[in-house]
Curated annotation (Swiss-Prot):
Upper taxonomic lineage: Viruses, Varidnaviria, Bamfordvirae, Nucleocytoviricota, Pokkesviricetes
Domain BEN: 112-222, 233-328
Role of this protein: Major early protein present in virus factories. The presence of BEN domains suggests a possible role in organization of viral DNA during replication or transcription. Plays an essential role in the inhibition of the cGAS-dependent type I IFN induction in host dendritic cells. Mechanistically, abolishes cGAMP production by triggering host CGAS degradation via a proteasome-dependent mechanism.
Compartments, record wording: Host cytoplasm; Host nucleus; Membrane
Induction / repression: Expressed in the early phase of the viral replicative cycle.
Protein name, as recorded: Protein OPG067
Gene that this sequence comes from: OPG067
UniProt keyword annotations, A-Z: Early protein, Host cytoplasm, Host nucleus, Host-virus interaction, Inhibition of host innate immune response by virus, Inhibition of host RLR pathway by virus, Membrane, Repeat, Transmembrane, Transmembrane helix, Viral immunoevasion
Main location: host cell
Record organism: Vaccinia virus (strain Copenhagen) (VACV)
Length: 341
């Protein structure tokens, strides 16, 4: 009888424990928790529209950055193949001009006058160079003159950036030519990958030191991507794709002008043109329709009121037609003086 009683007691304890567990875990026994008036206060409302919008922005930002890094890595990989091909071609070209004159082979070279000037200029810089790092820096000045203009966009460029988001890289294909020239001048045409990496780091330090002297003026700033709005969704997407490749508003203006007025820059006729007609100074006004396109693309990207943006845009157009910095060769003497110091 005593044993049976103990068993019953144990069974009763188990039943009560299970009932209590179900009572605690069941919402039916605690109507206050299920009541709509009960709100669990949190710092972030997970299901709110505002939170969803923030998450969408973060996701888009991450996707854009991931896409950018992927494209950069693809370009770098393609540049390695380009380096090998370019070096073989450069060595053959050098051998060719030892046995013949440039005048003899000029007809077979596309844009032979520009090619001849480029070869002549970079040879002059190479001959004057006494230090590999200074030679690379001088050739960057020569081949990327538009980056070293008044907007100081070179601040955002590095040869081997620590962050591919914070800094852009110089064109790997132009860097290949610079590398070949340095290997010819200092390393007897031997491929020195490790040495090139060290030189790149030294040049980046020079760029950092020079960057500390300047800032990008506020008038050249661009809006954050999410704040850029065109006249339509299609326009907005197109403008954002243009802006992705730019550091400053001046660079964006230049990019659009080179597309719309390509023939003028290619022929050299750009020298006779300005934003408006200027009979007294002998300048021809640019096509109004094309200028409107420039304004439609550039103004939505500038962090100022539209009337101010229009004035600044006009100034940048005139400035670029006065001195289009994408045309290389104008600063040859500056580059030679730099490597000679």
């Amino acid at each position: 009888m005593l044993i049976l009683t103990k068993v019953n007691i144990y069974m009763l304890i188990i039943v009560l424990w299970l009932y209590g567990y179900n009572f605690i875990m069941s919402g039916s026994q605690c109507p206050m928790i299920n009541d709509d008036s009960f709100t669990l206060k949190r710092k972030y409302q997970i299901d709110s529209a505002e939170s969803t919008m923030k998450m969408d922005k973060k996701r888009t930002k991450f996707q854009n950055r991931a896409k950018m890094v992927k494209e950069i890595n693809q370009t770098i990989r393609a540049a390695q193949t380009h380096y090998e091909t370019l070096k073989l071609g450069y060595i053959k070209f050098k051998r060719m001009i030892r046995t013949t004159t440039l005048e003899d082979i000029a007809p077979s070279i596309p844009n032979n006058q520009k090619t001849y000037k480029l070869f002549s200029d970079i040879s002059a810089i190479g001959k004057a160079s006494q230090n590999p790092s200074k030679m690379v820096y001088a050739l960057l000045l020569y081949m990327f003159p538009n980056l070293f203009g008044d907007d100081h966009r070179f601040i955002r460029y590095r040869m081997h950036p620590m962050s591919k988001i914070k800094h852009k890289i110089f064109s790997p294909f132009k860097l290949n030519l610079i590398r070949i020239l340095v290997e010819e001048r200092f390393y007897n045409n031997e491929c020195r990958s490790n040495k090139w990496r060290i030189i790149g780091t030294q040049v980046d330090k020079m760029l950092i030191a020079e960057s500390d002297k300047y800032t990008i003026d506020a008038r050249y700033n661009l809006k954050p991507m999410y704040r850029i709005k065109g006249k339509s969704e299609e326009d907005t997407l197109f403008i954002k794709q243009m802006v992705e490749q730019c550091v400053t508003s001046q660079e964006l203006v230049e990019k659009v002008l080179k597309i719309l007025f390509r023939d003028l820059f290619k022929s050299g006729e750009y020298k006779a043109y300005r934003y408006d007609d200027d009979v007294e100074n002998g300048f021809i006004g640019l096509d109004t329709l094309k200028l409107n396109i420039v304004h439609d693309i550039v103004e939505p990207c500038m962090p100022v009121r539209r009337p101010v943006a229009k004035i600044l845009c006009k100034e940048m157009v005139n400035k670029y037609f006065e001195n289009p910095l994408h045309i290389i060769g104008k600063n040859l003497q500056e580059c030679i003086d730099f490597v000679s110091e």
